[in-house]
């Protein structure tokens, strides 16, 4: 049987007080609606439909390249009206209705719900809450069968005492929805077409309503304002931290730690406070990450030490390297075994050989360093001529003195030595000493000029 997933993402989200559509606000570094789309992909959806309205062009742009069909809800007239915009595109098989601002729903929960659905059964995800707040309530008969769902604003005092709540997540068939949605009425307190009214229609036809519940209420938490967004972010990060702790990762403080992508850790990894991991990050056995470090789309091999306040992006780091503090590794950086990039050093598109050291206050970009190289403080590879980038090639065991400018394209042969304060613009042969600076002049007894009174 086919599966259509419908994601409702047309709301304005006025309480977010933002020009950006609510579903595009980021949770763990990814738009809310993208989390839901990822879940739909895990379910193996035949077709995925995103109902858009407010900020439609922004949503379409953000989701460009994803396998989705867009349906426009020009006027927001309720959830039933939103789903109705997709009717012409739906198959007759199973249909799952999700929400673009409910990002943490799990595929396992939805699979259990979908397993309940056929032409004689409708599926509804419910959750029991101590404080139901503004949620719709599940009304059951004496035999425990669901007879209808009443929205909070339309509920009586007795109905508001019910703690089993509607999550809004519904599983039905396309045939059922095509029959029921055109019959919806807007005669209610909100003046909207409620999707939930289809449950009364199902009951009238003798169609059973099967219910399922999430493993945690966190799965069905929605976002309406910045406070809820922040709370959901922290809940999500707590969950990620607990998983890592269970896997044996040592976190200095699980409450001060963010994963905004995929993080894989080996044995005996230590992560200090305030660290952020974005994209696809791998930390090998025994890696230590110092406080307030950002690592994005990088692989860090076993035994590497990363000191505080370092930024590592798009880098490959081999075993037992040492990075930081206050180091910045930009995309294309590859550090070999036991190499070192120290404080206030920036690298970009650079290969640093085994045991080589760039200890402090340097920029090394578009460069290749062999093994055993020492780069003195204040060394700069001058790689850009205003139009094009050029490479610097440094052989094994080269020693570069402090405050040196290497004007690319330039090559330093193996074992070469560069005197401190030099500006090197021509190749240096292997084993040679190159010094390129003006001769010092000293005037004894020099008296500085004084201002006239």
Curated annotation (Swiss-Prot):
Transmembrane segments: none annotated. Its EC number is 2.7.7.23, 2.3.1.157. GO terms for biological process: cell morphogenesis; cell wall organization; lipid A biosynthetic process; peptidoglycan biosynthetic process; regulation of cell shape; UDP-N-acetylglucosamine biosynthetic process. PROSITE patterns: HEXAPEP_TRANSFERASES (PS00101). UDP-N-acetyl-alpha-D-glucosamine binds at residues 8-11, 22, 73, 78-79, 99-101, 136, 151, 166, 224, 330, 348, 363, 374. GO terms for cellular component: cytoplasm; membrane. Catalyzes the last two sequential reactions in the de novo biosynthetic pathway for UDP-N-acetylglucosamine (UDP-GlcNAc). The C-terminal domain catalyzes the transfer of acetyl group from acetyl coenzyme A to glucosamine-1-phosphate (GlcN-1-P) to produce N-acetylglucosamine-1-phosphate (GlcNAc-1-P), which is converted into UDP-GlcNAc by the transfer of uridine 5-monophosphate (from uridine 5-triphosphate), a reaction catalyzed by the N-terminal domain. In the N-terminal section; belongs to the N-acetylglucosamine-1-phosphate uridyltransferase family. This is Bifunctional protein GlmU. The gene is glmU.
């Amino acid at each position: 049987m086919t599966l259509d997933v419908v994601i409702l993402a047309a709301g304005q989200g006025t309480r977010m007080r933002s020009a950006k559509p609510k579903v595009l606000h980021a949770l763990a570094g990814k738009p809310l609606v993208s989390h839901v789309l990822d879940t739909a992909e895990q379910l193996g959806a035949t077709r995925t439909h995103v109902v858009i309205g407010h900020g439609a062009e922004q949503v379409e742009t953000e989701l460009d390249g994803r396998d989705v069909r867009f349906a426009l809800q020009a006027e927001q007239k309720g959830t039933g009206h939103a789903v109705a915009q997709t009717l012409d595109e739906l198959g007759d098989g199973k249909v799952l209705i999700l929400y673009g601002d409910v990002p943490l729903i799990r595929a396992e929960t939805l699979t259990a719900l979908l397993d309940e659905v056929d032409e004689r059964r409708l599926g509804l995800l419910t959750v029991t809450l101590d404080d139901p707040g503004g949620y719709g309530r599940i009304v059951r008969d004496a035999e425990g069968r669901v007879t209808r769902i009443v929205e909070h604003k339309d509920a009586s005092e007795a109905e508001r005492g019910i703690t089993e709540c509607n999550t809004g997540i519904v599983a039905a068939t396309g045939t059922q929805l095509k029959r029921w949605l055109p019959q919806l009425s807007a005669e209610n307190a909100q003046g909207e077409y409620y999707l939930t009214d289809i449950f009364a229609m199902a009951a009238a036809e003798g169609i059973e309503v099967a219910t399922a519940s999430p493993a945690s209420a966190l799965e069905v938490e929605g976002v309406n304002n910045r406070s809820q967004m922040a709370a959901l972010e922290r809940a999500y990060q707590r969950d990620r931290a607990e998983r890592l702790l269970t896997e044996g990762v040592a976190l200095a403080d699980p409450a001060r730690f963010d994963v905004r992508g995929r993080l894989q850790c080996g044995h005996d990894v230590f992560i200090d406070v305030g660290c952020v991991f974005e994209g696809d990050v791998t930390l090998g056995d025994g890696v230590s990450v110092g406080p307030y470090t950002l690592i994005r789309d990088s692989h860090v091999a076993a035994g590497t030490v990363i000191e505080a306040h370092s930024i590592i992006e798009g880098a490959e780091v081999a075993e037992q390297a040492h990075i930081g503090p206050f180091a910045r590794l930009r995309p294309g950086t590859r550090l070999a075994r036991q190499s070192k990039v120290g404080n206030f050093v920036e690298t970009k598109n650079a290969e640093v050989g085994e045991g080589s050291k760039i200890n402090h206050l340097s920029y090394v970009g578009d460069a290749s360093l062999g093994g055993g190289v020492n780069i003195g403080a204040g060394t700069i590879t001058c790689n850009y001529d205003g139009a094009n980038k050029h490479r610097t090639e440094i052989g094994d065991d080269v020693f570069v003195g402090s405050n040196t400018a290497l004007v690319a394209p330039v090559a330093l042969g193996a074992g070469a030595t560069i005197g401190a304060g030099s500006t090197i613009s021509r190749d240096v042969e292997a084993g040679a000493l190159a010094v390129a600076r003006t001769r010092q002049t000293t005037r004894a007894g020099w008296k500085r000029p004084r201002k006239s009174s």
